[in-house]
A protein has these predicted regions:
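Alpha-helical transmembrane segments and immediately membrane-proximal extracytoplasmic
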Residues: 1-251
Length: 251
């Protein structure tokens, strides 16, 4: 199924939300606002890194990838062993077994490293980092709500996943059904939809297009600039002028 394809095995650890109280609506809207703001910040950061990488290094793709690999290697070497296994890290966050310190550090680390990897020019996807970032945000916010109020919001991890995907991709309905595919529980659709729609609206206040549409726009602009440069260096072709006969020559 989809959950096994993208690396999440959460059905056994997930406890479904039996009741949906009015207080859940308030907390989920607040989560959607926070996630929507950070999703737009993440989108702009990734696009800026891609734009700057192309501007600084141009067509020197090997140099870009080498420097990014060295920096990423140094970052991961300095991190604890928990961060060396992305699958285990995603499992800890998805199952709600990570504490707030691990969730926050995971968000910061993955936020920074994903932008750096995108700036390297190497092919790679953004979907899996979105899920992990959203889950880390949801776990952090859920733990904060529990610490401050004593109320335990059981779906914040999945609500954060769906909301972050919706904020970056501008697809709240798809994010909702993605969360359903991960959990196979219909009870999660309502809280996921609330958080995803809120994140979608907040992110659209800053820019109407998704991260993928803006990436395509950057690629088209780059191709147009390259075509203009090539046309500028080309010499215009003019056909040779035939020799003119002297005016006095009547033959």
């Amino acid at each position: 199924g989809l959950s096994s394809t993208i690396g999440f095995q959460l059905e056994r650890q997930y406890t479904p939300l039996v009741r949906f109280l009015p207080i859940d609506l308030i907390y989920l809207i607040a989560l959607g606002v926070v996630v929507g703001l950070l999703a737009e910040l993440y989108t702009r950061y990734v696009l800026t890194m891609q734009r700057q990488g192309s501007r600084w290094f141009g067509d020197r793709l090997i140099l870009r990838m080498t420097l990014s690999g060295v920096v990423l290697g140094c970052v991961y070497a300095a991190l604890p062993d928990t961060f060396h296994n992305p699958s285990e890290l995603k499992h800890l966050i998805g199952a709600g077994e990570a504490d707030i310190g691990l969730a926050l550090s995971s968000f910061v680390m993955l936020f920074f490293c994903t932008g750096l990897a995108a700036g390297s020019g190497a092919p790679g996807g953004l979907f899996m980092p979105m899920l992990t970032l959203g889950g880390a945000l949801g776990l952090t916010c859920g733990t904060g709500v529990e610490s401050l109020t004593g109320y335990v919001p059981t779906t914040y991890v999945f609500a954060g996943m769906g909301a972050f995907v919706a904020g970056c991709s501008r697809t709240p309905i798809s994010a909702m059904f993605l969360a359903f595919a991960l959990t196979k529980d219909l009870l999660i659709l309502k809280p996921i939809l609330v958080a995803s729609l809120t994140s979608f609206v907040v992110a659209r206040l800053f820019h109407p297009h998704s991260i993928y549409e803006r990436q395509m726009g950057m690629e088209l602009d780059s191709e147009e600039r390259m075509e203009k440069q090539l046309n500028r260096h080309r010499r215009p072709f003019s056909p040779p002028t035939p020799p003119q006969s002297p005016k006095g020559d009547l033959s």
